[in-house]
Structures are given as structure tokens and as C-alpha cells.
């Protein structure tokens, strides 16, 4: 099924690209979320009329994401206290949700889906640098300090 993208979508394309996707992906995700329209002549004309508005919205989203990334990078080390054994091994682990909650408590809104932990959850005490992807083009680094609870 051919669709015209109304938003930038990772691993698929940018605004205005006409791409071929599987029918189920289009019907169940792209079309209901408003991220694409079916590629036909009527929709192409409507899209070209709305193109400037959509590009302005995309630029505004990128600017807002850049500001959030600067705020996140400007944060001092975010401290998370967790129960730990004698050798610094945590009882449990610290995952995306815990990091997102700690950053939000520090004053910058962050969703758990934006936190990237490629090596999995954190299981020891210490200092860590966690990558946060606030936009498809914008990344930031959060300094995280995991300490043992007293």
C-alpha cells in the first residue's frame, strides 16, 4: 500500500515521502495515528496545500526537543537511591521508568520511552551516563548517580 507520510518516521521516511508499506502497518498504525494518508491524487493535492503547515509544525517540534535536550544536559547529576549489598550490587535494578521518574522529579519532563539503555538495566551502584532520545534527530546525555540507600 502506498502512503504519503505526514511526519518523520524512523526507518521509514520524512515528511512528504511517498513510501510503500504493508497494508496492516498502514491500516493499524500510520493512518489511525495521523502519521500518513493513502497516496491518491486527491490526497496528494490536499497534502501539497498543507505542506507548509506540516513543515512548520515539524520545525517547532524539533526546536522544542532541542530546548528539552539542553535542559536535560544542563542538569547536575541525577541521584537515584536504591537498596544495595556490600559490594555495590543492587537488590533489583534501575530501568527506564526509574530514570525517567528521577529526571522528571529533577524538573525536566521525560517519558520512559525516551530513555535508551542499550546494555540493559543498571544493576550496580556508581556513576553512569544514560542516553536520552527526545526526538528522532535530538539526543542528550543524563549523568546518573546510583547510590546505596542508608
Curated annotation (Swiss-Prot):
| SUPFAM superfamilies assigned | L9 N-domain-like (SSF55658), Ribosomal protein L9 C-domain (SSF55653)
In the UniProt record, which is one GO cellular component term? ribosome
**Domain of life per record:** Bacteria
Pfam families from the UniProt entry: Ribosomal_L9_C (PF03948), Ribosomal_L9_N (PF01281)
Q: Which GO terms describe its biological process?
A: translation
Which interval of the chain is the signal sequence? Answer: none
UniProt keywords, alphabetically: Ribonucleoprotein, Ribosomal protein, RNA-binding, rRNA-binding
GO MF terms here are: rRNA binding; structural constituent of ribosome
Q: Does the keyword RNA-binding apply?
A: yes
Task: Please state which protein family the record places this protein in.
Answer: Belongs to the bacterial ribosomal protein bL9 family.
Which HAMAP family does the entry mention? Ribosomal_bL9
Known role: Binds to the 23S rRNA.
**What is the recorded name of this protein?**
Large ribosomal subunit protein bL9
- Provide the species name: Shewanella pealeana (strain ATCC 700345 / ANG-SQ1)
Amino acid at each position: 500500500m502506498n502512503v504519503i507520510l505526514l511526519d518523520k518516521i524512523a526507518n521509514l521516511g520524512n515528511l512528504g515521502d511517498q513510501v510503500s508499506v504493508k497494508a496492516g502497518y498502514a491500516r493499524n498504525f500510520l493512518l489511525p495515528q495521523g502519521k500518513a494518508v493513502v497516496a491518491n491524487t486527491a490526497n496528494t493535492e490536499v497534502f501539497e496545500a498543507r505542506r507548509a503547515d506540516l513543515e512548520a509544525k515539524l520545525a517547532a517540534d524539533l526546536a522544542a526537543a532541542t530546548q528539552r535536550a539542553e535542559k536535560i544536559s544542563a542538569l547536575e547529576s541525577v541521584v537515584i537511591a536504591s537498596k544495595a549489598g556490600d559490594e555495590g550490587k543492587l537488590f533489583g535494578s534501575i530501568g527506564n521508568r526509574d530514570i525517567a521518574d528521577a529526571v522528571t522529579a529533577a524538573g525536566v519532563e521525560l517519558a520512559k520511552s525516551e530513555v535508551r539503555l542499550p546494555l540493559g538495566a543498571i544493576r550496580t551502584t556508581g556513576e553512569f551516563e544514560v542516553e536520552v532520545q527526545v526526538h528522532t534527530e535530538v539526543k542528550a546525555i543524563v549523568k546518573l548517580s546510583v547510590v546505596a540507600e542508608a
